[in-house]
Structure formats: structure tokens, C-alpha cells
């Protein structure tokens, strides 16, 4: 364990073995509630250990956008790692995880991931996730998008990541349709 990580109670997998680990990154894009809500849902999954990394920009954005404090959000995770600590456990391929979700994913973080520019722990953990062939999901909230953004998304998708814009489901009989009219 690195000095920058906070150790919480480690859940055990349902079968008693090592818990399943998922890395959650919250970057500085608007939409920090997506990462917060993800952590709230994951907290109730038996045998799941969440490793949270919050960027410096995200710490500012989430205070502007939500009623949560950084401490509130950190309390939702099993472990918290400092984004400046590129030597933390999620930076290593030997740290087995089920994958990583970056929600929201800023264009800066998207670009770092698409170009293997691992200057932060979020970028390094995402790079390791891709290199190890594990699932990486990026929730890119930016809009509108210019061609440079789209090229970065394409590059990341070609590497195996899932680019998941947070678009509400408006299919047949959606409960959201009446709210929009």
C-alpha cells in the first residue's frame, strides 16, 4: 500500500477468495455526479472492491456541481489513491482488476488515454487497463464535439475502450419522454 492510499475495509468475494477490484476515475469534466452515482451503486455489490482516483480538477468541479464534499465521495470507495501517485497499486499490471471506468472523462483525460500519455494515476491506470486487455469505459460528457475530440475517441475505441457518452435512453415507452415534452 502506498502512503497516498487510504485503506478501507476490504470486502471478500462471495466465495471467500480475493475480491473483485474495479478502478473508478473521476476527472475534471462537468458531470461528476456520474462518477458519484456509480460509486453509490457499486458500494452495494457484494465482493466488489472499488479503487477511486479523483483528479485535482475533479475535486474543484464536484464542489461546484454537487452538494458532496471530496471526503463524502472518498467514503463511497473501498480505497482512495492520489492522482499524483503514479506508483500506486492501480498503476501496475500485476494489480488484478475487473477493469476501469472514468466517469466523467474530460477531454484532457481522453486525450491522455488515447495517446498513452500516463502523467497522472488516472491516465496510467487506464493505460495499464488497456495494455492488460481489461475493460476500460470512458464516460465522455463533452458536447459539442469537434473532429479532434472524435479522433481521440476513435483512437481509444480502436485500442479496445468503450466510449460511453451519458445519453439518456429515449427508446420506446421511455419514462423520460414525458419529462422532455
Predicted segments — roles?
Residues 2-137, 141-181:
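A cross-family phosphate/adenosyl-ligand binding-site feature
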